[in-house]
Design a protein with these regions (language model features):
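Helix-adjacent hinge/juxtasegments
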Residues: 57, 68-72
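Short amphipathic alpha-helices within nucleic acid-binding modules
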Residues: 22, 86-91
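Mid-chain, well-packed structural core segment of small domains
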Residues: 71, 78-85
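Core segments of cupin and vicinal oxygen chelate
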Residues: 12-54
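A short, acidic/glycine-rich surface segment
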Residues: 32-34, 40-43, 62-68, 101
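Vicinal oxygen chelate
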Residues: 1-2, 35, 46, 89-128
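Exposed loop/turn and edge beta-strand positions of beta-sandwich/beta-sheet ligand-binding modules
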Residues: 5, 41-43, 74, 109
Length: 128
């Protein structure tokens, strides 16, 4: 078996409009397709980063909360490569998004910062 690449990442949200606004207005993703599924009372929306499909955003009525803590089993966080951490941090701040302090990865010297989506999923910006 030979994997080619990561095709997409599926994210389930508890408040569709809030999460859609976060991923599009804060992170700058574009909506490729948006479908309301009446039989499930849910949305399925495909989001692109730089024109490439990357995130599949789902809403479901009353989803269970995310496990607490970043060290819970399963997906730990989403990481996005950026050119300039300082510019990204300033933009997060102007949009009212709380974030951790910028840190330096000791093995590579790369800089990174964590913040959370509306449902508490950790997101990382990473710059080398």
């Amino acid at each position: 078996m030979k994997l080619k690449s990561v095709h997409h990442i599926a994210v389930i949200c508890s408040d569709y409009e809030k999460s859609k606004a976060f991923y599009t207005e804060v992170l700058g993703m574009e909506v490729l397709a948006e479908h309301y599924r009446a039989e499930r009372d849910s949305y399925k929306t495909d989001l692109a980063l730089n024109g490439n499909y990357i995130v599949e955003l789902f809403s479901f009525p009353h989803p269970p909360p995310r496990p607490t803590g970043p060290e819970a089993a399963g997906l730990r966080h989403l990481a996005f490569a950026v050119d300039d951490i300082n510019v990204c941090v300033r933009e997060l701040e102007t949009k009212g998004v709380a974030h951790e302090d910028v840190r330096v990865e000791p093995f590579t010297g790369c800089r990174f910062v964590f913040f959370k989506d509306p449902d508490g999923l950790p997101i990382e910006f990473y710059a080398c």
